[in-house]
């Protein structure tokens, strides 16, 4: 299944010192999930600080484990909203049956 994972700060925005201490761990951990095929796509949010991941997982709970396992999640700095997504099923009504 595919799950949209939309980040938000779990508490007040981290200080520059907190951010600078964790980013050297966050980036490689995120890239590993991408290279492992867990994160299919990733975007930077334009309306607020944060990211959006399209995650391949067996369930929403599995997606939660993956993204909360990232260093910012483990440090309690980042939380996510999780939205399971799939094919646009109503389009099937537009296909003529023979």
Task: Report each predicted region and the residues it spans.
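Conserved, structured core segments of small domains
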Residues: 1-98
């Amino acid at each position: 299944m595919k799950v949209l994972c939309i980040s938000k700060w779990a508490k007040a925005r981290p200080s520059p010192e907190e951010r600078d201490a964790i980013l050297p761990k966050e980036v490689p951990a995120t890239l590993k999930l991408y290279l492992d095929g867990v994160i299919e796509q990733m975007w930077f949010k334009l309306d607020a600080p944060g990211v959006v991941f399209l995650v391949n997982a067996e369930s929403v709970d599995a997606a939660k484990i993956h993204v909360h396992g990232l260093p910012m999640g483990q440090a309690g700095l980042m939380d996510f909203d999780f939205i399971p997504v799939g094919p646009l099923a109503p389009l099937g009504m537009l296909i003529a049956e023979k």
